[in-house]
Structure formats: C-alpha cells, structure tokens
C-alpha cells in the first residue's frame, strides 16, 4: 500500500503543479485538502481539478464561521496590524488551515503533509510551526525547497507539460491569496517598487475615483469588542463580514500598497485589499477610545504590536498568544456601543460614537464648573507631577 500525503490544496499555481510532482517523485497517494476560508472559488471546480490533476481524494472543509469567530474576532479586538499597515489577512488564516490539515492526516492515517509555499515566503514557517505544535511526528514535504523549478514561468511550463490547467499566464502572473478578510496581490511587476500598482487588479474594492459620488453612512454595533449589528440589523458572523466588505469596497475603502519585513529576513511588496477589516478597525478603535480607561488602553497599544508580530510569525498555537487573548477579552468587557461612519471615495470619517459604558463625561470635560473637578486642584497636581523635573533642574543649577 502506498504512503499517503495530505496536500494543502487551493487550485492555484503552486498547488496545481504539486500533485503530479509528488506522484512523479514519491510514488504516493495524494489526499488534497481545500480549506474554504471565504475565497471566491467554485469548490466543485476545485474538486474536479484536484482529481484531474491526479489526487486520490479531495476534502473541502468549509470553516468560514470558525475563521470569523475564533480568529477574526481576535483580530478586531486587537486592531491587529503588522508594521502599521498590514491587517494580517493571510496570517490569521494559516493556523486554521494547518489545523484542518492535521485533522485530515489523522483521519487518513497519513504520515506526511505537503504544502506549496515558496522557500522565500512566510507561509512555510507558519504552516510548519502550526503543524509541529499539533503533531510533532508528522513529516513535511515542501516542494519549493526541493525541486529545480525556480520561477513562476518555469512552474507554468511544468504544469502545462503535465496537462494541468493553471489560473495565471506569464503575462498576468500575480500570486493572490483570497479569504473572507482580504485578498493579497504579490509578484509580477509589483516586485519593482518603482512600478505603480494597477488598479485593474482589484477584486473587491472599487478604485476611489470610480466610487459612488454620494457619501454612504454605516453604523456598527459592537458588544464586548465584537461587531454584531450593521445599521441596526443583527447578522450572523460570516454575513456581517460579507456585508462590511461590500459596503466598504464599493466606497473605495481598504487598499494598502506596502513593503513589509518578512519573517524569513527579506523585504517584500504586496497590495492588499481589506475593505471590511479596514472599516471595522476604524469603528472599533473609536469605540475603544470612548470606553477603555487610560492605563488599559495604553498598555493594549504596546501589546498589540507584539500580538500582531506573533500572529504574523505563525505562533498561533502558543501559550503567549492564548495569554494575550485572555488579556484583550478583559480589556474589551466595556467595549459595547455603536459607531457611525461616513464613507466617501476611499475616505472614512467618524460621524458619531455612543455607548452606555462611555468614560467620557461632558460635565467633567467641559470648560465650565463641575462638582467633580475644581480648576484649583490642577495646581497641586502639577506641583507633584513636575517635582522630579524640578529636582533634576535644581541639582544641575547647584553644580554650576
């Protein structure tokens, strides 16, 4: 009986060529696993393509709701952003995909898991670290670190020689990753930072200059940091993300073009469309400013940098990540309320923020008199607050 290899399968270029390559080089039975995290693919066609490419079996795992509730909710609570711009769409999906690969490997009695990640990318680290955390005895096959195919063009040639249909051409050669949270575009002419990216590549965001000529308003109700309602309507988790993606996207919200520092040491350029995430982050951040006390708010900003880096690096199945998420759940206890945003041609403006848990008090914050705050109290506070600075200055003067 042949050994079984579980393959992380998307139907894209990298995994399209992996099935025949595995059969040619390892003489194994390939079990393809496509994890549906919201990519806009026809899953029946994905199944057909896997079988036509030589897979013995194909699993399609629909995990969109789990992706939202167990991963993206955490992203929103943290406003998790890598290096100030990247909303971690790929990074949050990888541990869930790895989890499903391990589950299928156990079900099939497979000793090997194969992925189509390139030897220069972050995903190879994310997948293999996650798999090792769940089953340290599963062996990894990583074709990009083994074969002599050294470019997208060569990969296409190999696929065509094996009769495998590929979704890209040598002219249109972007590598794309699509899920419910984002779509990324890398490779091709984007590899030269001098090249302006082409807006024709957009899949879910309307170019701002082509967006609606009238502003749109959207209100989001959060409960303990989690979005629950859009314009007063309660929606299921997946439907809510789809709704905000649509509204933000048609108003030109959510595209970033960035150069990032990869985990493996090099810099890379990508264009990311994250319409709904960009909108939800802005609304959530505004509500936090109203409802979270100063010390917790400031400490969360510091930890958010670490959390985002941890997720980017693929360290999801770790004690640190679990502990940080426990912390943010406590911080978010009072982050309940409604934020209304005005959207217009790629711009967002806060229209209103309301919460029963608001720590802002107009009576205290106004310039008028207040029973809780006497202007005269400020003098004593300033004297104490500035005391270290005064002492330091006095000591300097004594030495002159």
Curated annotation (Swiss-Prot):
Single biological process term from Gene Ontology: urea cycle
Subcellular location: Cytoplasm
GO molecular function: argininosuccinate synthase activity; ATP binding
PROSITE patterns, per database record: ARGININOSUCCIN_SYN_1, ARGININOSUCCIN_SYN_2
Disulfide bonds: none
SUPFAM superfamilies per UniProt: Adenine nucleotide alpha hydrolases-like, Argininosuccinate synthetase, C-terminal domain
Catalytic activity: L-citrulline + L-aspartate + ATP = 2-(N(omega)-L-arginino)succinate + AMP + diphosphate + H(+)
InterPro entries: Arginosuc_syn_C, Arginosuc_syn_N, Arginosuc_synth, Arginosuc_synth_CS, Arginosuc_synth_type_1_subfam, AS_cat/multimer_dom_body, Rossmann-like_a/b/a_fold
Residues annotated for L-citrulline binding in this entry: 86, 91, 122, 126, 175, 184, 260, 272
Keywords, ordered alphabetically: Amino-acid biosynthesis, Arginine biosynthesis, ATP-binding, Cytoplasm, Ligase, Nucleotide-binding
Amino-acid biosynthesis listed as a keyword: yes
Highest taxon above the source species: Bacteria
Gene3D superfamilies with a match to the protein in the record: Argininosuccinate synthetase, chain A, domain 2, HUPs, Single helix bin
EC number(s) recorded for this UniProt protein: 6.3.4.5
Residues annotated for ATP binding in this entry: 8-16, 116
Main location: cytoplasm
Pathway named in the protein's UniProt entry: Amino-acid biosynthesis; L-arginine biosynthesis; L-arginine from L-ornithine and carbamoyl phosphate: step 2/3
Residues annotated as binding L-aspartate: 118, 122-123
Gene Ontology CC terms: cytoplasm
Broad class of enzyme this protein falls into: ligase
Family to which the UniProt record says this protein belongs: Belongs to the argininosuccinate synthase family. Type 1 subfamily.
Oligomeric form and interacting partners: Homotetramer.
Protein name according to UniProt: Argininosuccinate synthase
Organism: Clostridium acetobutylicum (strain ATCC 824 / DSM 792 / JCM 1419 / IAM 19013 / LMG 5710 / NBRC 13948 / NRRL B-527 / VKM B-1787 / 2291 / W)
Gene name for this UniProt entry: argG
